[in-house]
Amino acid sequence: MAPSRKFFVGGNWKMNGRKQSLGELIGTLNAAKVPADTEVVCAPPTAYIDFARQKLDPKIAVAAQNCYKVTNGAFTGEISPGMIKDYGATWVVLGHSERRHVFGESDELIGQKVAHALAEGLGVIACIGEKLDEREAGITEKVVFEQTKVIADNVKDWSKVVLAYEPVWAIGTGKTATPQQAQEVHEKLRGWLKSNVSDAVAQSTRIIYGGSVTGATCKELASQPDVDGFLVGGASLKPEFVDIINAKQ
């Protein structure tokens, strides 16, 4: 990892927890040592964004797990970047595979959300990744490059964007991409940014890995030169998330 890229660890709590259990988790995180050279962001369920921001130590930022592409309106069940900021959250996760595959979000919609969230001043954790059949068909690069292009077409300021590579076959399955598999895709993504955006953006943009990251797997993954951090699912609800936060130490 280049010295200029601050290690980034995101915890995606998904649709999990209640005030009591999340309060206990927050207590563990508040007591934890967060290295000065590591940025930590937690993404609670929408209902608990305000609760998390009030309870979490300021050293840990808060993200929403999704947002819509416009400011206000008749969009039942949706949340806008302005509302997310009003809660005190500063990031949003967009394009997660569960949004793509469970809720049918298209690349086009995700790109529109990215553009609006950035215009409203949020940082964006933009997710990309291939399914198992796509990896087995040898089209991993094609898939992730196409997804990245739609995101890139909607980004003016890359300093507010973190790219999260999440192979869909490794999310919640217990299967983790090997450090070599992760590094290979991250290196190719950085090459794509260099060729299609700029060398400066390629060098400065953090590309993080997600997919069954645990306290046991994080150190070797973190040692890869193009792995700049993690987006953690299930393990972010457990005390081992502290070990993952400290993976570079």
UniProtKB/Swiss-Prot annotation:
Modification N6-succinyllysine, positions: K149, K156, K194
Reaction(s) catalysed (UniProt annotation): dihydroxyacetone phosphate = methylglyoxal + phosphate; D-glyceraldehyde 3-phosphate = dihydroxyacetone phosphate
Cross-link Glycyl lysine isopeptide (Lys-Gly) (interchain with G-Cter in SUMO1), where in sequence: K142
Residues recorded with modification N6-acetyllysine: K14, K156, K194, K238
TM segment ranges: none
Major subcellular site: cytoplasm
GO molecular function, one term: protein homodimerization activity
Residues bearing the modification Phosphoserine: S80, S106, S159, S198, S212, S223
Entries under PROSITE patterns matching the protein: TIM_1, TIM_2
Residue numbers bearing the 3'-nitrotyrosine modification: Y68, Y209
EC number: 5.3.1.1, 4.2.3.3
SUPFAM superfamilies, A to Z: Triosephosphate isomerase (TIM) (SSF51351)
Residues reported in the UniProt entry to bind substrate: N12, K14
Function, in words: Triosephosphate isomerase is an extremely efficient metabolic enzyme that catalyzes the interconversion between dihydroxyacetone phosphate (DHAP) and D-glyceraldehyde-3-phosphate (G3P) in glycolysis and gluconeogenesis. It is also responsible for the non-negligible production of methylglyoxal a reactive cytotoxic side-product that modifies and can alter proteins, DNA and lipids.
Assembly information from the UniProt record: Homodimer.
Family: Belongs to the triosephosphate isomerase family.
Protein name stated in the entry: Triosephosphate isomerase
Species per Swiss-Prot/TrEMBL record: Pongo abelii (Sumatran orangutan)
Native organism taxonomy: Eukaryota, Metazoa, Chordata, Craniata, Vertebrata
